[in-house]
């Protein structure tokens, strides 16, 4: 009520549900929910539970023959959910919301520092849900690596960094947001300032190094929910994480800061549908490192026997239509989709930035 009075919320049901998330475990085990589930589950071979992790153990005791799958679960809770999947024989799996990002439910996974910037109430130009493990261009986001570690499929730790420009500010999160972290060590303007390094790691411990200097070891793996935080001072260079099991190294990962001078680089991916080609556009330095914090507005020009089917990025708040031929890179990346005509003999693609960078390719 206080937030509504201040104009920070408009009182809609989605805002209410976000605020109520801290009480969701209590709500879903209420007897009224139990009664309704009895009717629904009586006619199903497998009961799909949306956001009802708190019922897994309880319902295993109440209904020994009920088989449960997490049909929709929160990304930040994958460690908790997967532990129960492995422990409880009647819980057979977990489906997060969601795998691939999408247009619609705008803002549900967008981290924010002011009401209205993210969440269900995110304003224009927010278009994407931004809750996918994979962004709308097919680029893996940190949550996908978190999940890979939890599933036991990755031995190397994975480094992300919470936005140091916002250090100390309160992050407004919906239940679909883990943090605002990005896997990069490019934070221009934050030199000498504190930063939170967020590491997803297997093993018993993880050690962090900044420019070769150890920042200490902390608990990792299952006992830490596979997510470990270090507060460090940001300085350009390198940040490296090393995971240990029984005192022995089992994996490591390093991020390097990119040089400020960059060029445009194309990476061409042929689609399974022969008429489509996917052209990734990167901002890279002379060493091939992606520059994530100097995004540029790009214009695409297609000539020959092909059409531009789409041009955009993983940014949940694009300012241009995907078929407009104009976009801005997001963390140093954009994607152009080319539709070739039947019998295409040749076509050309040229990408230009507002500050004079250009790159082109022929097909």
Regions found by a protein language model. Give the residues of each.
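Short, hydrophobic beta-strand segments
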Residues: 228-234, 323-342
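Conserved structural position at the C-terminal beta-strand
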Residues: 243, 283, 351-353
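Exposed beta-strand face motif in extracellular beta-rich ectodomains
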Residues: 235-239, 277, 343-347
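Extended low-complexity, serine/threonine- and proline-enriched intrinsically disordered segments
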Residues: 205-213, 295-309
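Short aromatic-acidic-glycine turn motif
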Residues: 218, 263, 301-317
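Acidic/polar low-complexity surface segments
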Residues: 12-17, 312-326
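Short, exposed coil/turn segments at beta-strand boundaries within extracellular/luminal domains
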Residues: 246-251, 353-360
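Substrate-binding clefts and catalytic carboxylate motifs of secreted carbohydrate-active enzymes
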Residues: 1-274, 286-287
């Amino acid at each position: 009520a206080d937030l509504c009075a201040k104009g920070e919320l408009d009182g809609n049901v989605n805002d209410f549900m976000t605020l109520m998330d801290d009480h969701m475990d209590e709500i879903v085990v209420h007897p009224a929910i139990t009664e309704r589930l009895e009717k629904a589950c009586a006619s199903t071979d497998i009961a799909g539970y949306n956001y009802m992790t708190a019922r897994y153990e309880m319902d295993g005791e109440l209904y020994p023959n009920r088989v449960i799958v997490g049909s929709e679960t929160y990304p930040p809770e994958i460690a908790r959910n997967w532990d129960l999947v492995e422990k409880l024989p009647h819980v057979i799996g977990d489906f997060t919301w969601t795998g691939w990002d999408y247009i619609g439910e705008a803002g549900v996974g967008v981290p924010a520092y002011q009401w209205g910037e993210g969440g269900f109430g995110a304003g224009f130009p927010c278009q994407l849900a931004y809750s996918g493990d994979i962004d709308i261009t097919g680029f893996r986001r940190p949550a996908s690596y978190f999940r890979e570690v939890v599933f036991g499929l990755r031995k190397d730790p994975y480094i992300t960094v919470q936005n140091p420009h916002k250090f100390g500010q309160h992050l407004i999160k919906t239940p679909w947001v883990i943090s605002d972290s990005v896997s990069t060590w490019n934070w221009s303007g934050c030199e000498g300032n504190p930063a939170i390094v967020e590491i997803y790691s297997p093993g018993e411990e993880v050690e962090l190094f900044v420019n070769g200097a150890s920042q200490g070891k902390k608990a990792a793996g299952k006992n830490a929910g596979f997510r470990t935080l270090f507060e460090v001072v940001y300085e350009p260079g390198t940040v490296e994480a090393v995971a240990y099991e029984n005192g022995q190294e089992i994996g490591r990962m390093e991020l390097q800061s990119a040089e400020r001078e960059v060029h445009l680089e194309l990476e061409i991916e042929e689609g399974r549908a022969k008429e489509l080609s996917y052209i990734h556009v990167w901002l890279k330095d002379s060493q091939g490192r992606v520059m994530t914090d100097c995004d540029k507005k790009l214009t695409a020009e297609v000539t020959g026997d092909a059409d531009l089917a789409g041009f955009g990025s993983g940014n949940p708040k694009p300012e241009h239509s995907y078929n407009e031929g104009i976009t801005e890179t997001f963390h140093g990346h954009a994607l152009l989709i080319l539709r070739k005509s039947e019998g295409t003999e040749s076509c050309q693609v040229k990408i230009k930035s507002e500050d004079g960078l250009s790159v082109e390719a022929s097909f």
